[in-house]
Amino acid sequence: MSEFIFHMAGSGNWRKYFSSEAFYLLYERIYPEGINLKKLNGSDRDIIYKCEKVAFVEVKDNFVNPKIPLFTEPDYKKIEKWLTKFEKDYLKVINKHKEEYYSLARLISDEEKIPEEYIFTILLCAYTLDAGTLEKLEDGILGRPPSREDSGKYFLWGEKIAISKNYFGVNTYEIPQNKLFSVIWMPEIRRSFENINSLTIPVFNSSVMEKIEKLYSSTSEELAQVFSSSIEKIKLNELSFANCSLKDVFCMLFHIGYSYVTDSLIEQGILSDFPKEITDSWGMWIWNK
């Protein structure tokens, strides 16, 4: 069984072509050095040809080069100093704005009758550290997620080592009447919407969203600038993903970096700890499109 966990950022379903364990095991086998196509059996070559269509690998002169980065423990050791500096620079920006976040969280909490610290987590983690900063990076150093045939448009990366205890992301779904439903997801948490009779979650109207967007947009811009300038200090040629797709590499490092920062925010008491056991409504909210 493969030890890697894959993540994506964007829209679509990367597992559309690669739902079997055979893909994971093959990719782990050829990463990072690559492999001569002639050394693979027929079923493995079929997987490689599928991977090539969605730019997971590059096949040139009968040699297979893996293009999706995988983060390993040796990689972590080589960028640990970078992560520490990155964390410090991110925290400087967050501390500069945190009172504004507390104030807005308090305002929304009073209106929604939802705990203030929960609203604060949504504002800082979901809107700012994740979606807001990623949006700014897509306007700059990242560009838009690459098209992967009919499986969607997304960045993709894998991890063999989880350096953060609080890795998270945000998924958004459309619901009727011009509303959007969002949820903070974490890999270790499995949710089921079956047999749920009611949910107590915040609903952000257009007036609230205007305040939220104004706050996270400016903060995310600063964080994106920190990431973009700091990434230049990483010696990519020394890492396992040196020859992988640069966009996927940058997206991976962005997600690893902000999750690392999240741990620090929790340790310092700025953020409440993510629950080990959650209700089905934790990390969910509805907002105007």
Predicted features and spans:
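Short alpha-helical segments that sit at the start of domains
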Residues: M1-L26, N195-S206
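Short amphipathic alpha-helical interaction segments
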Residues: L37-D61
